[in-house]
Amino acid sequence: MAIAAVMLGPAPAMAGVGGSGYFPNVPLTTQDGKVVHFYDDLLKGKSVVINLIYTQCSGSCPLETARLSQVQRLLGDRVGKDIFFYSISIDPAHDTPETLKAYAAKFHVQPGWLFLTGKKEDIKRISKQLGLSSVTDAASLDGHQPALMIGKEATNEWMRNSAVDNPQFLAMTILHFFDGYNAKPVQSYADMGPLHGVGRGEYLFKSRCTACHTIGKGDRVGPDLLNVTRLRDRAWLARYVAAPDRVLAEGDPIAMKLFARYRNVRMPNLRLSTEDVDALLPYMEQQSQDIARPAPKGSPSAQ
């Protein structure tokens, strides 16, 4: 039975599924051109985090990679030491090692995270055995789901999670899955103080945009969005936020210029509704205004 059959939620895999007799030991090539074998070199005895990507993806892949880049920074030097990140291309005909290396650099990937390519039939087999393939893949714009497989091969425990979840949540999920009760304690909710209500625009920005953008804190993978609602035509901005892939495909000069300036990183189409865009743009506008507004006299930021 494939792992996919028991991976409907974040739960351990069935006992007896896994090991050298289950996972293919096929050769793959890293972004540095090194040939490795999937089971012997990448899985055996290791704690791993695996997802599927391809570099020409205009859907969830850029967000997946940006999110995992944030998670990698949160996990620090454990990535590559006792936790291993693997992103496997499902478009090996295009995604050569050189292409994958350039793609990783765009997202500021640190050492310890491998981007892998190989034969298409081998990658399909890996995807199926990991439980990362789905009957809905063909209907998906990306050809796959934005899923993440977290696994401890030594104990044959596996958990599937969204690859575009909150990075702090993902990092803590990974640590607790691998470390159990030995994981470092986190701050108590009692110490957090009062919580403010989160509006739709703020929720969308923090859940969909912060992996690649800031407002007033400089460029990341994409541009700083400070004053973007003032600098860009409102109708153009709304259309671009809703369907950036379509605007770029039409050869729009602003979209083309942004694409070139930010190292050909494709802004993902996040399937935002008109209502989503109508909430997101005012939030960005308000945040820009708050940054521009002088702090009250006597406040720490005014001193």
Put a short name on every predicted segment.
Residues 38-64, 68:
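Short active-site neighborhood of thiol/selenol oxidoreductases, capturing the structured segment around
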Residues 57-61, 148, 201, 205-215, ...:
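The canonical Cys-X-X-Cys-His
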Residues 102-145, 250, 254-261, 266:
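Short, internal strand/loop/helix patches
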Residues 176-204, 221, 300:
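Electrostatic cytochrome c docking/interface patches
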Residues 214-246:
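Gly/Gly-Pro-rich "capping" loops immediately C-terminal to redox-active cysteine motifs
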